[in-house]
Design a protein with these regions (language model features):
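Membrane-proximal helix-turn-helix segments that form the acceptor-binding/catalytic region
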Residues: 4-5, 18-19, 32-52, 66
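Acidic donor-binding loop of glycosyltransferase active sites
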Residues: 50, 167, 181-198, 211
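Carbohydrate-associated surface elements
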Residues: 58, 80
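A short helix/loop element that forms part of the nucleotide-sugar donor recognition site in Leloir-type
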Residues: 87-106, 253
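Conserved donor-binding/catalytic core segment of Leloir-type glycosyltransferases
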Residues: 107-132, 145
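Glycosyltransferase donor-sugar binding loop
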Residues: 116, 143-156
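Nucleotide-activated donor-binding/catalytic signature segment of Leloir-type glycosyltransferases, i.e.
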Residues: 154-178
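Conserved acidic donor-binding segment of nucleotide-sugar-dependent glycosyltransferases
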Residues: 229-238, 246-252
Length: 288
């Protein structure tokens, strides 16, 4: 309303549907009376800005199709990644890897499957632990490095109940500045996120690090990973485990897919590219 009263253009950063995320997180029931009210309020807010920026084409289509926003007002600018910070095995690769595995007392002969992000059910962590049990049963040389918070104790108990506690390490919270070296110490990355209404920025960090990546299939995952990603059936831990096992058993495939994803990240998702797109939007509005 301040922008309207001063007659200055307003740009809205759309991170996902409020109603859809409240339903995803279980804050309200789909049949609640609040559902219609929240949808009405959200729609009104979405119609206020001169331009809306989304982090994926999927989110752009949601605004156009579900909220009837004019296509010319909605611009998809993907989440971006610092491809200079997130690199494949930065610095002295063996030294960095050794530092990480020594820090967490992981046997140095294991292949690491990494996850970096929030620990929550909607992020698919229970599915990841179920998949880990299947993977470790078939490939005892695998180790899962699960980086993030909260809920560490909850998921640790889940891993213990599966009998895989010696093959799963929970690091807790990792600072942004430590994230590149932690990811570079891993061999495979995984993102079992279930929500289709949000972005999935962790995929870009994986890609920039040159990690072969397995994700649950979805529009956002395919938009980011392209043809070089591996897509498991959503919510199916057996499918997730199968894709991880295929990568564990083929070093050449891991290298090829990781290199391809790194190239894609640099070409399409770098900070420089995103900065340029944002600059052009603001310039357009200032000239109106």
């Amino acid at each position: 309303f301040v922008a309207m009263s001063r007659r200055v253009p307003m740009v809205f950063d759309f991170q996902g549907s409020l109603l859809a995320e409240m339903l995803d997180h279980g804050f309200i029931d789909r049949h609640s009376r609040l559902t219609s009210l929240i949808s009405l309020v959200e729609g009104s807010i979405n119609r206020l800005p001169n331009k809306i920026i989304t982090s994926s084409t999927n989110a752009r289509n949601l605004l156009i199709d579900s909220f009837n926003i004019e296509p010319e007002r909605v611009v998809a600018i993907s989440d971006c990644v610092d491809t200079n910070a997130f690199t494949p095995r930065p610095g002295h690769p063996e030294h960095n890897r050794s530092r990480i595995i020594n820090r967490y007392r992981i046997p140095n002969n294991r292949l690491l499957i990494g996850y970096l992000g929030l620990l929550a059910d909607y992020q698919g962590i229970p599915h990841l632990i179920e998949a880990a049990a299947k993977v470790i049963e078939s490939f005892p040389g695998a180790h899962f490095l699960i980086m993030g918070y909260p809920g560490v104790e909850t998921y640790q108990r889940m891993a213990t109940q599966k009998g895989i506690q010696d093959h799963v390490t929970f690091t807790g919270r990792i600072s942004y500045f430590e994230a590149p070296q932690h990811l570079a110490a891993t061999d495979i990355a995984v993102s079992p996120k279930l929500s289709e209404t949000e972005g999935n920025g962790k995929l870009l960090n994986y890609m920039a690090t040159g990690l072969p990546t397995v994700a649950f299939d979805g529009e956002v995952a395919r938009e980011y990973l392209g043809e070089s990603g591996r897509f498991a059936v959503p919510g199916d831990h057996h499918s997730l485990a199968e894709h991880i096992l295929e990568l564990l058993n083929n070093a050449t495939t891991r290298t090829c897919e990781g290199t391809s994803l790194r190239t894609r990240a640099v070409a399409n998702f770098s900070w420089d590219r995103g900065r340029s797109q944002l600059h052009n939007i603001y310039q357009e509005l200032l000239q109106c």
